[in-house]
């Protein structure tokens, strides 16, 4: 992974950790924890600023809309998107492979039946096309 992406990943991990800590503080808020909460919120803002600075270094990264809508918004691991894409590609590959095999069998059967029905013409065809049978 390139350095800008590693920096972004590090900043995002720190941001997520800050949000997690803020959530813990807020869920059991006590007045004496106000200073810690303020520090965490300031750290969160600083983290967002750092992430914004890294934006220009990773502009060429394309993230499909489905990752946000179908995975992140649905509380799923975004890395499952890649797994699902590979599984869909494998399924489509198997489907196409089946069609190709079916067409090969059809070609073989068609040539055999044509040879039975039109032997002279098929001999001429075989002489013309060496790869036909």
Curated annotation (Swiss-Prot):
One of its GO terms (cellular component) is mediator complex. Disulfide bonds: none annotated. The keyword DNA-binding does not apply. Keywords: Activator, Nucleus, Transcription, Transcription regulation. One of its GO terms (biological process) is regulation of transcription by RNA polymerase II. It holds the Pfam family Med10. It is found in: Nucleus. It comes from the Eukaryota. One of its GO terms (molecular function) is transcription coregulator activity. PANTHER family: MEDIATOR OF RNA POLYMERASE II TRANSCRIPTION SUBUNIT 10. Belongs to the Mediator complex subunit 10 family. Component of the Mediator complex. Interacts with MED4 and MED21. Component of the Mediator complex, a coactivator involved in the regulated transcription of nearly all RNA polymerase II-dependent genes. Mediator functions as a bridge to convey information from gene-specific regulatory proteins to the basal RNA polymerase II transcription machinery. Mediator is recruited to promoters by direct interactions with regulatory proteins and serves as a scaffold for the assembly of a functional preinitiation complex with RNA polymerase II and the general transcription factors. Required for activated transcription of the MtnA, MtnB and MtnD genes. This is Mediator of RNA polymerase II transcription subunit 10. It comes from Drosophila melanogaster (Fruit fly). The gene is MED10.
């Amino acid at each position: 992974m390139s350095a800008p992406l590693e920096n972004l990943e590090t900043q995002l991990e720190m941001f997520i950790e800050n949000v997690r800590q803020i959530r813990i503080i807020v869920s059991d808020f006590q007045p004496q924890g106000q200073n810690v909460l303020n520090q965490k919120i300031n750290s969160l803002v600083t983290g967002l600023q750092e992430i914004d600075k890294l934006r220009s270094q990773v502009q060429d990264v394309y993230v499909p809309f489905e990752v946000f809508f179908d995975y992140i918004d649905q509380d799923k691991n975004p890395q499952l998107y890649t797994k699902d894409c590979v599984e869909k590609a494998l399924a489509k590959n198997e489907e196409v492979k089946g069609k190709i095999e079916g067409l090969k069998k059809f070609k073989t059967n068609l040539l055999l039946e044509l040879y039975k029905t039109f032997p002279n013409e098929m001999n001429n065809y075989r002489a013309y096309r060496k790869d036909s049978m």
